[in-house]
Amino acid sequence: MSKSDFSSRCGLLLIVTALLVLSGFAAVTPVEDDKPASLAPGTAGTLPDGEGWWYARFHIDWPEDSQIRWHMGTLIGGEVIAPVFDEYYQDIYIWRVHRRASRDGGHIFSFIFYSTPQGAQRIYTAIQNNGVVKSLLDSGQLTRVDIDDVTRITRPNIEDTSDARWAEPVQKTWPAMIMGASRMWLDMVSELAAEEYATSDLDKKYRKVQDGLTDLWQDQGQHAMLHHLNAVYAYQPLLMRY
């Protein structure tokens, strides 16, 4: 491998790693009210026409002087998002998951999807009625779950949840890329969770699943993901900014 090839690979690894870290901790504005938003009372006949982006934000308990419990987002993915997606995938045009953890904003796992208000209402109802969600709220492991008001479409454009600093073509096409990454992650969660079928303790189970995800990412992410993403873009060097 030539020095220039090595530099290009190192540059790619650093910039993609930086982007992953930044996107994982980017600010997602939570609902300002201290109480969870309630499901809109309107029926399918009274909801507006059209499609837009919708958020379900799961606020995870994070006591002071304690480590971030990343496995809780993985638990929500496997026990809440996966069954909801399997049931209502026809309502979802495009979607992704998102994580953030900062002391000013808290630890939040988000399910973000593009759908009609009617589809959003069905999905929100399924989340609200999910037994694991109820259990996590009752135990205090989830402090609240915030949802959007389905009577108003506030993010109708496909680029409305992309970073406004990006070029327009990137804003409009990035959701497809991150959906693929999210689907791969969710399927990996399901695969690893199936191997822990004998474990009834969900917290213990998803700690193991998260450890497995970390091992796979660290061992195979460079070639399975970063190398092939670089290949799609013709192995060109990247401009790096911090």
PLM region spans:
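Bulky hydrophobic/aromatic packing residues
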Residues: M1-K3, L19, F109
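An acidic, charge-biased composition feature
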Residues: V21-Y242
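Bacterial N-terminal signal peptides
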Residues: L13-S23
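Bacterial N-terminal signal peptides that target proteins for export
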Residues: S2-L13
